[in-house]
Amino acid sequence: MNGLPVRNGGDDVLCLFLEPYGDVFWLKPGDEFTVLPGEGVPDPQFTVEMVKHRLIVWVFEGGDPAKVVVDCTVVDSGGNELPEGHQWPDGRSPY
């Protein structure tokens, strides 16, 4: 399955912000997660936008902006599914 690997190569936590629902996952320095579209999504295409301390990810079916993929999973480097809000640091906002 087509997935988007995301790695935090910085020295501070990084927020992975998954649209369209705004699900957030926090990567500590050195962490690597992968965004996986739901089963059966044909030709998933990823769009990534970087803003301060945040990566915003959209997934589209076949690259069509009218076909937003809403069923996605985020896994760690061991393949373990991560819950929304994973590693959310105290006092940090994704905005």
PLM regions and their residue ranges:
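Asparagine-centered strand-capping/turn motif at beta-strand->loop junctions
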Residues: N2-G10
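Glycine- and charge-enriched low-complexity intrinsically disordered segments
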Residues: Q45-Y95
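Short, structured beta-strand/loop micro-motifs enriched in basic residues and often containing a Trp
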Residues: G10-E19
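Charged, amphipathic alpha-helical segments
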Residues: M1-N2, F33, V41-P42, M50-I56
